């Protein structure tokens, strides 16, 4: 069992039950999944870029990403429906806990001028979205092997009903929120 999952079961659950007055352990919010998405805008001119993004994401997440395709054609962006425009991966269970542990304790502190993540990025339903500007903050990515600095979106989906509950959950798990 991963470190973060153990922390959740031993420390976070009792703390949340006390703070929000849950009667049943099943009411306590928990992490459902983490979705990591890399939008590859240059995929239409450069098919190799999609492959490179896939490899980066595979190394970061430890899981094979799936290619996302355009839902509809947009002439301004010169994309047609069905064209590959990015890669994403959905992590659940152990892999999710391991990824978040790595994100909170290793990757985020490596961001330049890092003062904490914004506490305003919740969506109103207890999910958190985080944008990362470069994939280099992850220890698995070798600086010499990347073709281009790529950002990514990390969405943390929880079972919390409100943003307040979700923030408490993530804070107790060790998410470094800005003060």
Swiss-Prot record:
Domain of life: Bacteria
Protein purpose: This is one of the proteins that bind and probably mediate the attachment of the 5S RNA into the large ribosomal subunit, where it forms part of the central protuberance. In the 70S ribosome it contacts protein S13 of the 30S subunit (bridge B1b), connecting the 2 subunits; this bridge is implicated in subunit movement. Contacts the P site tRNA; the 5S rRNA and some of its associated proteins might help stabilize positioning of ribosome-bound tRNAs.
Protein name: Large ribosomal subunit protein uL5
PANTHER family, A to Z: 60S RIBOSOMAL PROTEIN L11-RELATED
Signal peptide start-end: none
Gene Ontology CC: ribonucleoprotein complex; ribosome
Entry keyword set: Ribonucleoprotein, Ribosomal protein, RNA-binding, rRNA-binding, tRNA-binding
Family from the record: Belongs to the universal ribosomal protein uL5 family.
The keyword Ribosomal protein is annotated on this UniProt entry: yes
Assembly behavior: Part of the 50S ribosomal subunit; part of the 5S rRNA/L5/L18/L25 subcomplex. Contacts the 5S rRNA and the P site tRNA. Forms a bridge to the 30S subunit in the 70S ribosome.
HAMAP family: Ribosomal_uL5_B
GO molecular function, one term: tRNA binding
GO biological process: translation
NCBIfam families in alphabetical order: PRK00010.1 (NF000585)
Organism: Caldanaerobacter subterraneus subsp. tengcongensis (strain DSM 15242 / JCM 11007 / NBRC 100824 / MB4) (Thermoanaerobacter tengcongensis)
């Amino acid at each position: 069992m991963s470190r973060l999952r153990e922390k959740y079961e031993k420390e976070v659950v009792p703390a949340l039950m006390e703070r929000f007055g849950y009667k049943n352990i099943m009411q306590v919010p928990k992490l459902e999944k983490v979705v990591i998405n890399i939008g590859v805008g240059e995929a239409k001119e450069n098919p190799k870029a999609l492959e490179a993004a896939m490899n980066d994401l595979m190394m970061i997440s430890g899981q094979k990403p799936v290619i996302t395709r355009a839902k509809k054609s947009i002439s301004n962006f010169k994309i047609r429906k069905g064209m590959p425009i990015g890669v994403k991966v959905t992590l659940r269970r152990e892999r999710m806990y391991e990824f978040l542990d790595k994100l909170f304790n290793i990757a985020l502190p490596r961001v330049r001028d890092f003062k904490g993540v914004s506490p305003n990025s919740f969506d109103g339903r207890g999910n958190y979205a985080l944008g990362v500007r470069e994939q280099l903050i992850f220890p698995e990515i070798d600086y010499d092997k990347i073709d281009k600095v790529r950002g990514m979106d990390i969405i943390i989906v929880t079972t919390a009903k409100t943003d307040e509950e979700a923030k408490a959950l993530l804070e107790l798990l060790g998410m470094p929120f800005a003060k």
